[in-house]
Structure formats: C-alpha cells, structure tokens
Amino acid sequence: MKLKPIEVADILQKEIANINCLSELEEVGQVINVGDGIAKIYGLANVQSGEVVEFESGVKGLVLNLENDSVDAVIMGDDNQVQQGDKVKRTKEVLEVLVGTALLGRVVDALGNPIDGKGDIKSKEYRHIEMKAPGIIDRASVSEPVQTGIKVIDLLIPIGRGQRELIIGDRQTGKTAIAIDTIINQKKAHSLNDEKDKIYCIYVAIGQKRSSVAQIVKKLEDAGAMDYTIIVSATASEAAALQFVAPYAACSMGEYFRDNGKHALIIYDDLSKHAVAYRQISLLLRRPPGREAYPGDVFYLHSRLLECAAKMSEEKGGGSLTALPIIETQAGDVSAYIPTNVISITDGQIFLESELFYKGIRPAVNVGISVSRVGSAAQIKAMKQVAGSIKLELAQFRELESFLQFGSDLDSATKAQIEHGKRLVEILKQAQYHPFSVEEQIISIYAGTKKYLINIPVERIKEFEEKMLSEIKQNQKDILESIKSEKRITEENEQKLKTFLENFVKDFVKID
C-alpha cells in the first residue's frame, strides 16, 4: 500500500497529538546574592512582578524588583535557609491564602498556615491575597450599624457596616482594647443564630510581641469570642516580608465572607508597623526613599488595602467588610506622614489621648476631634434621640473646665453646666471587656442627658448606673424590649422611662 506524502503528514500530526508528554519544562534561576531577607536571582528571564518563586530549601519568595539581568525577591521566611548558589524555580503563581469558615477559631501566620497546634485547617478554598476592590456599581451605601458595645463610640462616633474607621493614638492609650471589646460584643449576635446580624471578626497582629498576641488569644477564648474570630499573626520576630503580606492575607479571608453575603470586621493592629516593614523592604530593594524615608507608593500600600472594605449591593449578596485600622502616633502628632495618609483614606477616626487616659477617662476618646463621616446613616433612631446635643455639651464643658482653676467666682448657670458636664464624662466611662447592649447604652445616656444625675455625687455615678440597669432588667423589661424591637423611643415608652428614673433617683438619693 502506497501512501501519498500528504497522508503521511496527516498520520504524523495525529500521532504527535496523541502523545502524552508528562515532562514539563521548569524555569530555573540561581541565587547570586542573599542578605537581610532579600535574594538577588539570575536566570529567571520571564518571571513577573508579584510572582511566587521557590528556593531549593522549600522556602518561598516574592518577586518585587525586575532588572535587566536579574530579579530581587523578598524571602517569605528564614533567610538563613537560602544560600548563594541555590537553585530557584518559578511557580507561575501569585500569593494565595486559605479562606473559609474552617479558619474560624484558629491562629494562623501571614501565609495562612496554622500556628496554634490544633492540626491542619480543613479548607480547600484559596484566594489571591491582592484582589481588586469592588467598583462603585457593586457597592451600596453604609446603612447598618456595627455595635461596638462602647458607649462613647456607638453614641458619638457610630460605625457602619462597610465603613473604615481609624483608631489612632499614642502607645498605651487603649487602641487594641477598643478593637478587642468590639470583637467580644459580637458574641450576643452569634448566640442568636441570625446570619444577617452575625459579624465574623479577623484580627491581624503586625509587628507585635508574641506575648501580646498570646494574651489577646487567651482573652478572646475566655470571652467565648474565638468561635467567630480568625487571628493572623506576623510578630516582630518574623521576616519583614511576612509583616508586609499579613494584612493583605487577612483581608482576603474577610473578603470571602463579604462576597458570600456575610458580614465581617477586620482589625489591622497596627498599620504604622506595617508601613515600617514596607519601608525596610523598599530600602533593601534600593528603591528611592521619600518623606521620612518611606517609598513613594506608601499611600497606595494602605489605600489598596482599605478600599476592600465595602458594603456590597443586594445584587452582589449584600455582604460587608468593615475595617478598623490602628495607627500609633508619637507624642500625639497626628500630622506625621503615615497618620495623615490613613486619616485621608478612612471614613473617620477615633482619637485616643494620653492625657485623658492618665486622668482616668477610659476609653480615652477625644470627642472633639474624633469623627465618623458615614456612620450616622447607620445609627439607629433611638441612639440619635438620646445623643442630641451631647457633643456640644461636652465641648462646652471642656472649655469651661479651664475656668475651674481660677477658683469659684462663677455664676450659678456656669457652675450647673460644669456639674452636668462632669456627670456626662462619668457616664461615658466604661471598664475594659465590659461591653453594653444597645438598650443599656440608651438608658444610661438618657439618664445623663436629661439631667437625672445632677443630684448624684460624681464618684457614685458608676454605682448608680449599675443599680439602675440591674433594676430595669429585673422589673421594667418592657422598656428594654420596646427599644430593642422599635429601634426608637416611643412617646409611651419615654413616659414609662421618665417615671422609672424619677422614682429610682429619689430612692437612690434617699438611701444615700
């Protein structure tokens, strides 16, 4: 049988197509220099920026600099395991992290590996650590509240689901305490088993001491809050590359909940250390330094992270991701580079002051310069009813307070205003790890703003509040239930509340 040349060509093509070629070409380069967590690699001509490479020892690297004849990669782990002359291969992948509900209750590192000794995480879903933020069309306006359980915040600086609210202040002023209290306060919503009220929490520790992270884990476990919380830890002892990646990895975990119609809250503690880690990497990569030696793209570093916080439209599932970034200031200087950057990115800030903290006013929130730009739309009507002019009254009190040092030559109206201000400040104080329900907050603030506390000594305000809330829970539950269901104070309920407070104040003063 004679075959025509064209038939031979067809047969050969079919045979070639049927060959199962198992061998795969790998692009391999070589480490020509390594030090300070940076490896210079020769021979990876086609590698892309942001691609993951794998070193001979199994340690991963992230390519950040592309040059004519070499590339620079940050080592995602111990740089002692990478030696000059080691082979490096391309993975043709970008950084991914495990996501899903299986992560709840776990402590993981910046790459999503468990570090709590509780075994592997049973999740098969991965997500890229840098996803594009939702567009304008995919978003909805902020309309539902995130209840922190902290009176001064829920009343005066309300936070909505999908908002980005900065917590800023000097070291040791209670920034982390506010974040942890907010996580603990979500426990009640999780116990009610209504998915639309639940908020899943993610806490990212960047550049902190391991002992501090261990304390936070212990506190959340004791409060029963770890069941709905993920902790991502990139401590001070870990590579700068891991501290740089940690917030993005945690954000991807939060985006999983947001994109599946659920609600998540993410706390970045803190972004000052994140910027320092990025500055370290940039300087080692020999990128040009700018103001305070930070690289030129340090604004974009945080803006692309915080833009992922959003309230999604109903067409996209109606989920949300709320961000609470934390920034540490030096001697109260909010005009420094990183603080001003993050203030301009976020939708408001809670400013904590050392002076107030040392005076015993805790949480040490400076109400005058703290603001929530979009949260008021999410605040329930009952809160707006009791808040009234409290911000103005507190500002006037702060102004009049300075006159106290000049003695008692003040008119009776000014004295009365100062006494009222002192009681407002006292009623807004709150112990750590002691969140209040919305109804309890409303009752307490109502008593303060309507001047029911004027005859009660300042040092007994806390005792009065505890006894009043205990009494109302036992004998006037209908007042609390009405506020909870109506989300406002009805005329009938207000009358009941007035009668209760008048009688309770009389009895309290009489016992005194």
From Swiss-Prot:
Cellular component terms (Gene Ontology): plasma membrane; proton-transporting ATP synthase complex
Topology term for the membrane: Peripheral membrane protein
Positions that bind ATP: 169-176
Gene3D superfamilies: 2.40.30.20, ATP synthase alpha/beta chain, C-terminal domain, P-loop containing nucleotide triphosphate hydrolases
Site (Required for activity): 370
Catalytic activity: ATP + H2O + 4 H(+)(in) = ADP + phosphate + 5 H(+)(out)
GO MF terms, alphabetically ordered: ADP binding; ATP binding; proton-transporting ATP synthase activity, rotational mechanism
Coiled coil: none
EC number: 7.1.2.2
Enzyme class, spelled out: translocase
Location of this chain's protein in the cell: Cell inner membrane
CDD domains reported in the protein's UniProt record: ATP-synt_F1_alpha_C, ATP-synt_F1_alpha_N, F1-ATPase_alpha_CD
Source organism superkingdom: Bacteria
SUPFAM superfamilies documented for this protein: C-terminal domain of alpha and beta subunits of F1 ATP synthase, N-terminal domain of alpha and beta subunits of F1 ATP synthase, P-loop containing nucleoside triphosphate hydrolases
Family: Belongs to the ATPase alpha/beta chains family.
Role description: Produces ATP from ADP in the presence of a proton gradient across the membrane. The alpha chain is a regulatory subunit.
Subunit record text: F-type ATPases have 2 components, CF(1) - the catalytic core - and CF(0) - the membrane proton channel. CF(1) has five subunits: alpha(3), beta(3), gamma(1), delta(1), epsilon(1). CF(0) has three main subunits: a(1), b(2) and c(9-12). The alpha and beta chains form an alternating ring which encloses part of the gamma chain. CF(1) is attached to CF(0) by a central stalk formed by the gamma and epsilon chains, while a peripheral stalk is formed by the delta and b chains.
Name of the protein in its database record: ATP synthase subunit alpha
